[in-house]
Amino acid sequence: MIKPTVIKIGGATLGSHDTALADIVEIQKRGIPLVVVHGGAKVVTRWLERQSISTRFIDGERVTDESALEMVAAVLGGLVNKEIVAAINDLGGEAVGISGIDGALIQSRIRNRKMGYTGNVVRVNTGILDTLLSSGYLPVISPISSHTLDRPEDTPPMLNINGDTVAGEIA
């Protein structure tokens, strides 16, 4: 199998005049294997504000406390991921939305305590990607990971990961 091209898109791609999704569909139709990793920081921030959950950033990355982590997982793993998958499928592509948790795709550990539940990628298990790609599907990945390595019992089973980092690690 040919190594897939990994494309990182922002959540802002939806509803804009950006042609990225149409371009992705065109590439998939040519038989070139692709993996899409998406972000969605602005959408997450909007939802956090709606829930009156304060958010702060250090060096451009979200500090993720437990309340924010729940919202990040819901918004990125649910809303943003499914909107991107629906848009790609509406354009004639064949996309499947997953998160880094699914199939133990991304395993990580907490980067440092000041960032809260934000992690560093430790391992990428591409088995689920290989399965989807060999069946002709375009995996669309939200940057949430399994927090399985060195996880203290009192911490959540998932972590927020920067989408650019996830894309780089998968590539």
Name each model feature, range by range.
Residues M1-I170:
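Nucleotide/pyrophosphate-binding catalytic subdomain
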